[in-house]
Amino acid sequence: GLYLVSGNHSAVPEGVGSLQPPVWGLDSLLPAMPDPQGHAVGIEAPGGWICRISPDGKDWTMVASGFRNSVDLAINREGELFTFDSDLEFDVGSPWYRPTRVNHVTSASEFGWRAGSAKWPEYFADSNGAVVDIGPGSPTGISFGHHSNFPDRFQDKLFICDWTFGTIYTVDMEESGSSYVGTKREFLNGTPLNISAMRF
């Protein structure tokens, strides 16, 4: 099938099936504080989402949600899906700031992005955590190296692009339970080096 990734401002189209139960109520104990800059005020769950689409385009199924603004996907040799999700620059310095991060997109996963202070912390049992936090930036392209012409040591690395700081990182991943933990390393940077996409 095909995959479509969409940011937090994109509504889920009508008729889309879901692997998740649609229980996206903002049912926090304390009321959420909206973004003081007005970003995403009134935008409610599920936030950004990923759908699997049949080759004929007729059947859409949401496989994961709770993203801020992922713009690309990568699939490893085992067929597992990953994305590089955005932060919200207005949140830097707030207790609910969530850095850009690499996510392992498992079936029916929820990553807990909500507007303002309502983001789910990683310790919530039903919120998937990140493989690795990257920090402030603007995620764009993401690709595994197994179709590149790089030397063998790069073939299984995940390459991620940051437009803001003109940086390409590599991420090494180790299995951790049913997911992964990662370590980032700067691969290339420059000024300007505004990378918007990457494919090998």
Feature map (PLM): residue ranges:
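Beta-propeller domains with acidic blade repeats across secreted/periplasmic ectodomains
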Residues: 1-200
